[in-house]
């Protein structure tokens, strides 16, 4: 299994380096170079870097992909598609998915809404110092606790009903209420939580 780190253009205050492949998205490419990390892929329209910075990225990147600013995908979506083309079994961690432009952040939260990325949703994690976001397809799944993290929230795409079992606040047919996001739940004694979603996907 190939472990891929994608460095996007949001806040990059906390990251780890134990990866096989490093991908810079737009200005994230410059961040990798400035932190003396590999730049295996540089992907984006690069509208957030200067001409000199762009030339440096071109020179240092093993694979350089420059897209038109007028495109259907965000730079992060494009980078993920390129990664999964080359490494279809990769586990991808995205740093810098939050803290920048809010439209980019929202796009990152709903990455599985792209039909080309939906098959890979379980292979994508968004991470910063305080947050870990993962995606789950419809059906039943177990959510495992993360060290140092107590709280857990669930957001279901679409209108399907969600059930939650094993959390501090369970949700089933007896107490069901409809919300877009079920926030501020908690793990109990670091035990897994089982969630079931009839259709769509779960964030």
Segment roles from a protein language model:
Residues 1-2, 20, 88-91, 122:
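Short coil/turn segments at beta-strand junctions that form active-site/ligand-binding loops
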Residues 64-87:
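Short phosphate-binding loop-to-helix
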Residues 91-139:
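Anionic-ligand-binding alpha/beta catalytic cores of soluble enzymes and soluble regulatory domains
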Residues 129-131, 136-203:
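Long, charged alpha-helical interface segments
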């Amino acid at each position: 299994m190939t472990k891929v780190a994608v460095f996007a253009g949001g806040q990059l205050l906390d990251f780890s380096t134990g990866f096989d492949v490093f991908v810079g998205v737009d200005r994230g490419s410059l961040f990798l170079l400035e932190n003396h990390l590999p730049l295996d892929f540089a992907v984006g329209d690069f509208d957030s870097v200067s001409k000199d910075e762009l030339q440096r990225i071109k020179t240092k990147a093993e694979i350089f992909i420059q897209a038109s600013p007028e495109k259907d995908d965000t730079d992060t979506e494009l980078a993920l598609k390129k990664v999964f083309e080359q490494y279809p079994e990769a586990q991808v961690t995205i740093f810098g998915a939050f803290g920048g432009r809010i439209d980019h952040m929202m796009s990152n939260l709903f990455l599985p809404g792209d039909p080309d990325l939906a098959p890979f949703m379980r292979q994508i994690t968004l991470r910063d110092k305080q947050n870990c976001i993962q995606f789950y397809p419809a059906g039943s799944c177990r959510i495992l606790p993360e060290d140092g993290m107590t709280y857990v929230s669930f957001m279901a795409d679409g209108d399907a009903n969600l059930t939650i079992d094993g959390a501090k606040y369970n949700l089933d047919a007896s107490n069901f209420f409809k919300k877009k996001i079920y926030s501020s739940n908690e793990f109990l004694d670091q035990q897994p939580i089982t969630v079931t979603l009839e259709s769509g996907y779960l964030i």
